[in-house]
Curated annotation (Swiss-Prot):
It catalyses: S-ubiquitinyl-[E2 ubiquitin-conjugating enzyme]-L-cysteine + [acceptor protein]-L-lysine = [E2 ubiquitin-conjugating enzyme]-L-cysteine + N(6)-ubiquitinyl-[acceptor protein]-L-lysine. The gene is syvn1-b. Residues 335-370, 386-426, 509-595 are annotated as: Disordered. Residues 335-353, 390-408, 514-552 have a biased composition (Low complexity). Residues 20-35, 114-129, 185-218 are lumenal. It comes from Xenopus laevis (African clawed frog). Pfam families: zf-RING_2 (PF13639). Pathway: Protein modification; protein ubiquitination. A zinc finger (RING-type) spans 285-324. Homodimer. This is E3 ubiquitin-protein ligase synoviolin B. SUPFAM superfamilies: RING/U-box. Zn(2+) 1 binds at C285, C288, H306, C309. The lineage of its organism: Eukaryota, Metazoa, Chordata, Craniata, Vertebrata. InterPro entries: HRD1_E3_ubiq-ligases (IPR050731), Znf_RING (IPR001841), Znf_RING/FYVE/PHD (IPR013083).
């Protein structure tokens, strides 16, 4: 780049001199020719770039990666603002105007590098004398140049009136403010490096330095905007730097107020850490990495640090260094309750506690139903009524038929009351309530649509797997459809598990099987009446007929005297029909043989 620009410049100058053959006509020809001026501008920019690299080597040595990144980032914004300034001052556009803006951008770059290099002093433990010499020489040179250009702009405005020098005067005044802040930071860092122990008040001085310089920048930008609007036009190129200056000043004010509040809370609200607390925990302060023997404070989050370390920390941020808890919010005292709030709290305590319905006893090894709302796809269902034919309440006592019937009656009354009190009861023949009776009324379009089940459940084929591989739109849609199918299957499985557990809870544990004696009575009535053997007569009028839905029936009363006279006082046993018939036939044959 350097060689090409140098060759182009030499060729242009040689061509102009070849045409004019004299120095003055050659200079006039170069200044009037647009292509020649463009090549000369390029050569001037190359020379400025080379001068900047040389001065960077002299004052900074090797630039760090962070410094180069910040320089490039700020340079792009500065070039954009310079182009906007060219549009505002298009009437004053000239080679001298371009040279002044180029020089301003050149000096801005060195101001930014000086600021980054001084900030590096706080993170570097070893600072050489060469570093101090370079920084002091650079700050002295930049300060002298800023003061010179400010005085030059002032004299130009006084003698010639409002011109483009107004912009350069305010720009160099702001650069003077920046170099002043850099110099104060350099002094503070140098004092801190010379002391053996960390300087606690350095953060305080740096905070007030930023507050002071930020206030000066805001005043300068406001004055510059006011003057430019009155004498020329609205300075569009100054909007971004003025906004950044105001934001920085606002941040400095907020940091100053919040840091003072945090330090006041630390001195008044936070207790000192005792020796037992220091021994019970790791007594190394994570801010300075030194052991805490005395002079430690315990924050509301129970983390302990040096008091001096906390004071320096709170100058920048008001959070716990370990857990990032906001110490200002945690330190707010509780507000006393007003009489109205106390009365409302007293009334809330006097209100009766709502009675929670008892949970049903689930069989061993079974899980209770899932709570409503766990799966948002399915709305919560109402209370399930007992399944028809299932025992209600406790199982009846076989030894006490009266208590069984009484408990059955009470259970029936309870079920009637429950069915009246719950509108979402199940319809006859259905073990579950209707889906829309046991749930609250939703707003329009409030119920999500039921998803369509997947086409198959045997797994994904090779074609479906290949359809999901890739990063195109159809591959993404295939993966989303697969996830939707999985979500549908999981919701359906959870619903069926909930229904299954509800049915198990309603039917209760299994009861021992009890056979009915009605079949034996029917078989006894079919025996021939011409037999000479006296068959046992059962008093059917005293049999209590029970409903088929009940699991246990009352004992059937029989004529014990008749049975005793015929069979020697034996009580009939509940046996199957074929065994009873066989026994009776054997008795009949034995009676016939004896006669």
């Amino acid at each position: 780049m350097t060689g090409a620009s140098l060759a182009l410049t030499a060729s242009v100058v040689a061509h102009a001199y070849y045409l004019k053959n004299q120095f003055y006509p050659t200079v006039v020809y170069l200044t009037k020719s647009s292509p020649s001026m463009a090549i000369l501008y390029i050569q001037a920019f190359v020379l400025v770039f080379l001068l900047g690299k040389f001065m960077g080597k002299v004052f900074f040595g090797q630039l760090r990666a962070a410094e180069m990144e910040h320089l490039l980032e700020r340079s792009w914004y500065a070039v954009t603002e310079t182009c906007l300034a060219f549009t505002v001052f298009r009437d004053d556009f000239s080679p001298r105007f371009v040279a002044l803006f180029t020089l301003l951008l050149f000096l801005k770059c060195f101001h930014w590098l000086a600021e980054d290099r001084v900030d590096f002093m706080e993170r570097s433990p070893n600072i050489s004398w060469l570093f101090h010499f370079r920084i002091l020489a650079l700050m002295l040179l930049l300060g002298v140049l800023d003061a010179f250009f400010v005085s030059h702009a002032y004299n130009s405005l006084v003698t010639r009136g409002a011109s483009v020098q107004l912009v350069f005067g305010f720009e160099y005044a702001i650069l003077m403010t920046m170099i002043l802040a850099v110099f104060i930071k350099y002094i503070l860092h140098s004092v801190d490096l010379q002391s053996e122990n960390p300087w606690d008040n350095k953060a305080v001085y740096m905070l007030y330095t930023e507050l002071f310089t930020g206030f000066i920048k805001v005043l300068l930008y406001m004055a510059f905007m006011t003057i430019m609007v009155k004498v020329h036009t609205f300075p569009l190129f100054a909007i971004r730097p003025m906004y950044l200056a105001m934001r920085q000043f606002k941040k400095a004010v907020t940091d100053a107020v919040m840091s003072r509040r945090a330090i006041r809370n630390m001195n008044t609200l936070y207790p000192d850490a005792t020796a037992e607390e220091l021994q019970a925990m790791d007594n190394v302060c994570i801010i300075c990495r030194e052991e805490m023997v005395s002079g430690a404070k315990r924050l509301p989050c129970n983390h302990i640090f040096h008091t001096s370390c906390l004071r320096s920390w709170f100058q920048r941020q008001q959070t716990c260094p370990t857990c990032r808890m906001d110490v200002l919010r945690a330190s707010l005292p509780t507000q006393p309750q007003t009489p109205a709030e106390q009365q409302n709290q007293h009334q809330a305590q006097q209100q009766p506690t709502p009675v929670v319905p008892p949970q049903p006893n689930f069989p061993p090894g079974m899980l209770p139903p899932f709570p409503p709302g766990m799966f948002p796809l399915w709305p919560p269902m109402g209370q399930f009524p007992p399944v028809p034919g299932a025992p209600v309440g406790n199982p009846p006592d076989e030894a006490n038929p009266g208590s069984s019937s009484g408990s059955s009656a009470r259970a029936g009354e309870t079920s009637n009351v429950g069915s009246e009190s719950h509108p979402g009861a199940a319809l006859p023949g259905f073990p579950f309530p209707p889906p829309f009776l046991g749930m609250s009324i939703l707003p329009p379009f409030g119920l999500p649509p039921m998803p369509m089940p997947p086409a198959g459940f045997a797994g994904l084929t090779d074609e479906e797997l290949r359809a999901m591989e890739g990063h195109e739109r159809q591959n993404l849609e295939a993966r989303l459809q697969c996830l939707q199918n999985i979500h549908t299957l999981l919701d359906a499985a959870m619903l069926q598990i909930n229904q299954y557990l509800t049915v198990l809870a309603s039917i209760g544990p299994p009861q021992p099987p009890v056979s009915s004696s009605s079949s034996s009575s029917a078989s006894a009535s079919t025996e021939p009446t011409t037999s000479s053997v006296s068959e046992p007569v059962i008093d059917t009028s005293s049999i209590v007929t029970t409903d088929s839905s009940q699991q246990s029936a009352s004992p059937v009363p029989v004529n014990v005297e008749t049975l005793g006279g015929a069979e020697g006082g034996e009580t009939p046993t509940e046996e199957p029909d074929n065994v009873e018939l066989r026994r009776r036939r054997l008795q009949k044959l034995e009676t016939t043989d004896s006669q």
